[in-house]
Amino acid sequence: MISINEVQSIANYCKLRFNEQELNHMVKQLSSIVEMMNKLEKIDCTSVPPMRHFEENNRMRKDQVEQNITVDQLLSNVPQSSATIAKNTKYFVVPKIIE
């Protein structure tokens, strides 16, 4: 069982705040998840063949720079109120959202 202090500690790391009702709900949910994980941990999987070979390399495409859209095409979507600034700086101007 996970304690309220553990949930508060995790919430502090994540910069989250919970009221008492939410905190109790999180304790129940996280305890349930840990309980399920403990059940899964007890399952014997030694006879189950792996579904993926870990020796395989990732088959990813090579990174290649491609010009799909021009800066002018992008900036054509800028609202008129910030168009001059955006065209001079080549950046989108957005409202401040973090204090």
From Swiss-Prot:
Coiled coil: none
EC class of the enzyme, as a word: ligase
Gene Ontology terms, MF aspect: asparaginyl-tRNA synthase (glutamine-hydrolyzing) activity; ATP binding; glutaminyl-tRNA synthase (glutamine-hydrolyzing) activity
Record field: catalytic activity: L-glutamyl-tRNA(Gln) + L-glutamine + ATP + H2O = L-glutaminyl-tRNA(Gln) + L-glutamate + ADP + phosphate + H(+); L-aspartyl-tRNA(Asn) + L-glutamine + ATP + H2O = L-asparaginyl-tRNA(Asn) + L-glutamate + ADP + phosphate + 2 H(+)
Superkingdom, natural source: Bacteria
UniProt EC number: 6.3.5.-
UniProt entry keywords in alphabetical sequence: ATP-binding, Ligase, Nucleotide-binding, Protein biosynthesis
DNA-binding in keyword set: no
GO BP term (any one): translation
SUPFAM superfamilies: Glu-tRNAGln amidotransferase C subunit
InterPro entries: Asp/Glu-ADT_sf_sub_c, GatC
Subunit-structure text: Heterotrimer of A, B and C subunits.
Role this protein plays: Allows the formation of correctly charged Asn-tRNA(Asn) or Gln-tRNA(Gln) through the transamidation of misacylated Asp-tRNA(Asn) or Glu-tRNA(Gln) in organisms which lack either or both of asparaginyl-tRNA or glutaminyl-tRNA synthetases. The reaction takes place in the presence of glutamine and ATP through an activated phospho-Asp-tRNA(Asn) or phospho-Glu-tRNA(Gln).
Similarity remark: Belongs to the GatC family.
Name recorded for this polypeptide: Aspartyl/glutamyl-tRNA(Asn/Gln) amidotransferase subunit C
Gene name tied to this protein: gatC
